[in-house]
Amino acid sequence: MSRSSDLFHKAQTIIPGGVNSPVRAFKGVGGEPVFFKSGKGAYLTDVDDKQYIDYVGSWGPLILGHCHPKVIEAVDNVLHRGMSFGAPTELEIQLAEKIASLMPSIEKIRMVNSGTEATMTAIRLARGFTNKNKFIKFNGCYHGHSDSLLVKAGSGLLTLGIPSTPGIPQSITEHTLTADFNNLEQVAQLFEKYPNDIATVILEPIPGNMGFILPKIEFLKGLRELCDQYNALLIFDEVMTGFRVGLHGAQGLFGIKPDITTLGKIIGGGMPVGALGGKREIMSFLAPEGPVYQAGTLSGNPLAMAAGLATLKEIEKINFFEDLSNTTNKLTEALADAAENANIPFFAASLGGMFGFCFTDKNSVENYLDVASSDEVLFKKFFHAMLAQGVYFAPSMYEAGFVSSMHGDLEIQKTYDAAELVLNQLKSA
């Protein structure tokens, strides 16, 4: 038995499912998870001393790779002065100013501890600011595990939210409305049905938890127009896309300004973090300036602020995102070439340092159902075979992957060689 397997069995006796976040348990691909002990650059090393090219990147935060010297130095400098004070620090101002200077829609920003906190607070703020209760989310878009946002889509066009986990009363999600991503008509119908009741529309501008879905520009523009028409707020959940797909987030790439933006991952440089920001008059509705309450013991803690600030300074450098995008494109092209050589249907897409792929003969993937209809059995086989070759992709067909600035031509070539070997083996099996 490997040490990884031994640790997993031990973990299951003391931690529910043996993990502290469900996707890590490999339920989406079967088998047992790998336990890691270290990371450096584009690589992870497991507890059995096997090395992997890492395309998970701690689920997005590590855009500079593991243990980037500038981030380590920044954290080390702060660490010896104090890890948390529960009081304001200058670093909070510095990171807030840096984010506001880069993110087009943000005039004021509040730091929290996770993406879940950020989206939960954003919904509360939107409801408080508009004095309305209902909101629209999209099937397959994940916004953390707060009760009102953890909703499974119903079968009807205008179905009210149904909790997707025990422990959430129907009364909590009765104000959650759902629609299909990239389907503006469904959103318009929801507004027509509830013209005075919808506080906000929340979405990942590029969903990363139902694969990797690029939005139709007309869809995003239409959402902005509908929100303006019905006096609702538009929330972009850029926890994943913020500073990952471009220096100014997805909103900068697409030229759409939301009223509220939620952030996380990269702005903490690998430390736990979250944030929400937006128009001055909306953000001023948060306590202690306004009536909408939000608080957090470790919000704005110095370690996360230092790591985030160091990360943002690095990604501001000339050609950073051009180089990152080129590397990511090379990766998806390499995977597509390997699949084509094996005559296996395959679709991949990428933007900035974010990508996704699935085994399908579709020429485009536009929503959750498109991803769900792809070949999940083949994905599972591919995942495990690539893992055996030392390539670590996300252990779920529905999760996006991530490339860091430390990935280069060598890693792409190794990945291509492994994929070509694996796909030919799977084709002939």
Curated annotation (Swiss-Prot):
Q: Which SUPFAM superfamilies match?
A: PLP-dependent transferases (SSF53383)
Q: Which coarse location class describes where this protein primarily resides?
A: cytoplasm
Which residues does the record list as N6-(pyridoxal phosphate)lysine (modified residue)? 265
Necessary cofactors: pyridoxal 5'-phosphate
PROSITE patterns (UniProt xref): AA_TRANSFER_CLASS_3 (PS00600)
MF terms from GO for this chain are: glutamate-1-semialdehyde 2,1-aminomutase activity; pyridoxal phosphate binding; transaminase activity
Whom does it interact with, and what assembly results? Answer: Homodimer.
Q: What is this protein called?
A: Glutamate-1-semialdehyde 2,1-aminomutase
Task: Please name the source species.
Answer: Legionella pneumophila subsp. pneumophila (strain Philadelphia 1 / ATCC 33152 / DSM 7513)
